[in-house]
């Protein structure tokens, strides 16, 4: 059976307001999936249903083709967006306790806790109370709590929130270690540039419905704009008068522009070559931010 976590046609309403509408996507083993959407789009509700914190009105969540039960969910790692830590409890003591709740012996939980705190740069503060930590360091503790039992699946709600650039790099390294070990990782984030850099697959949700999902390459190809970039030896200002060209940006010899459907990019390239050397010319790959705006507006 393929190691895939599948969300299939999940819907959920609160009172008369439907917040999820037939949400469907896969999280594949060994791949990192970014879950992006505006505030209130349905990301957290979806994750809570995946972990059994909330029940779906309809639809299913399966792992390796089987419905999730309590025993299966104990093998998942989950980091909620809200702080779920005991403020007056020691860092290591807290993670050890949570590891035991997932079935680890105290010795195993202690060993794994100290290894994780070392990896996350918190080993020297293992006995401090959580309330003494910065928000960013509390975030690291929450990640350690999600990882301590070596989960089969990892679901993280805004794991990069409040982290400085160095802490982000550490977190990225930890998540990549998990995917390299074959773990499917799903995380939500508002940092689209980070998601684009880090993730293999993307899921975009808006108003409780999935607007786009697939691999990073597939989405870029599917939502590619008729946009090109050119760099010539001299000034590229002549593009202003070229038929079918709409300038997006122009900076001396470099320009980014859109082509109308009737325009011929090869004819334009020949025109550029007639005017002098062309250092580069080609289509511009859309960014995740551009794809996000296109599918959610």
Positions of PLM-derived features:
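ABC transporter nucleotide-binding domains
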Residues: 4-5, 12-206, 212
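Short, flexible helix/strand-to-coil boundary loops that buttress conserved ligand/catalytic motifs
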Residues: 72, 223, 296
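C-terminal coupling/interaction segments
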Residues: 260-297
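ABC transporter nucleotide-binding domain
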Residues: 172-259
